[in-house]
From Swiss-Prot:
Its EC number is 3.1.4.41. Binds 1 Mg(2+) ion per subunit. Keywords: Hydrolase, Lipid degradation, Lipid metabolism, Magnesium, Metal-binding, Secreted, Signal, Virulence. This is Sphingomyelinase D. GO terms for biological process: lipid catabolic process. The active site is at H44. It comes from Ajellomyces capsulatus (strain G186AR / H82 / ATCC MYA-2454 / RMSCC 2432) (Darling's disease fungus). Catalyzes the hydrolysis of sphingomyelin. Sphingomyelinases D are produced by some spider in their venoms, but also by arthropods such as ticks, or pathogenic bacteria and fungi. They might play a role in pathogenicity through different mechanisms, such as membrane destabilization and host cell penetration, but also pulmonary inflammation and cutaneous lesions.
């Protein structure tokens, strides 16, 4: 073989070997991301547009909004005593829609008049189950508002029902039978109980639209060591994650992490394998503060150091 032919053969061998040795950068990147779990830092008690901006600035990619019904419509409101009013839900939704690149979903924590009794209660709060479908205080109107503003922006919607009697309400019955695109339902408790409620009362909720949460206002209360069979927060969420991996539920969230909960956050992510954590203050609306920033960093920095997680964006669809 002449030197020229040997040179040509050598070049051809290199050209043939290159694509076999080096994978396509684009596909490799997608594959690497696909093997990681999108993780959600959910800002707790976001009741106004300033709180939303602060949460995003601190690193949140999802927000939990406590809501209550009034004759004028739905409002961000936590304790329905007239002292925790925030912005109208319409204004909140519009603000979230503008941040759709950063916010993956909105968790709507539905409050009811049953939470408040006595002379100090806000008598203007209405029971949405007793509102007519066309009334602004109805569940129908709430869903229409979410579908009108959030769904077109690609922001997912999570209806949360927490507390005694919540799943016996007409509001829950309506939502479980009328879920639309981009919507899911969240029930709180140990996974066996949650699945039992879905089976008996929420048959309209498909497994891919089922979400469960478990926790306590102060995360350290009843947290456990993640090795128990159940009951304790970490073990209960670990059991939920196992059910998720079987396809019984779509997402599993824990709550509420605050400043100083870094070790417990790590356990929820690494041992309980949750999809996300509600963080912030225990009983105060969300705002920018060194404590809320620290609580957010506990999640975001842990995820950044992880080999199998990444912080979700608006492009990630949790359900």
């Amino acid at each position: 073989m002449t030197p020229l032919l040997r040179t040509i053969c050598a070049i051809l061998c290199i050209l043939i070997a290159v694509p076999l040795t080096f994978a396509c950068p684009t596909k490799a990147g997608v594959s690497k991301q696909a093997n990681k779990r999108p993780t959600y830092a959910i800002a707790h008690m976001v009741l106004d547009r300033k709180g939303l901006k602060d949460a995003i600035k601190n690193g949140a990619n999802s927000v939990e909004i406590d809501i209550a019904a009034y004759k004028e419509g739905w409002w961000a409101d936590h304790d329905i005593r007239g002292r925790s009013w925030g912005d109208s839900l319409e204004d909140m939704f519009k603000a979230v829609a503008k941040e759709s690149k950063n916010i993956a979903f909105v968790w709507l924590d539905l409050k009811t008049p049953d939470m408040c009794s006595g002379a100090t209660c806000n008598k203007d709060v209405l029971d949405p189950s007793k509102c007519k479908p066309k009334d602004k205080c109805s569940m129908n109107s709430l869903q229409e508002l979410a579908q009108k503003i959030l769904n077109p922006a690609g922001v997912r919607i999570l209806y949360g029902f927490f507390g005694a009697g919540a799943t016996d309400s007409a509001g829950f019955n309506y939502i479980q039978g009328n879920l639309k695109a981009g919507e899911a339902v969240c029930l709180s408790g140990e996974v066996e109980n949650v699945l039992n409620v879905y089976k008996k009362k929420g048959r309209g909720v498909k497994p891919q639209q089922r979400v469960m949460d478990y926790g306590y206002t102060q995360l350290e209360t009843g947290f456990g060591n993640c090795k128990e069979k159940g009951y304790n927060t970490c073990a209960g969420l670990r059991n939920g994650a196992k059910a998720r991996d079987k396809g019984d539920v779509k997402r599993v969230f824990g709550w509420t992490s605050r400043v100083g909960d870094g070790e417990r956050v790590g356990q929820l992510l690494d041992k309980a394998h949750v999809d996300g954590i509600i963080y912030g203050f225990a009983i105060t609306r969300y705002y920018d503060h060194e404590d809320s920033r620290a609580a957010a960093r506990d999640i975001t920095q842990r995820v950044q150091k992880s080999d199998d997680r990444y912080m979700a964006t608006g492009a990630d669809k949790p359900w």
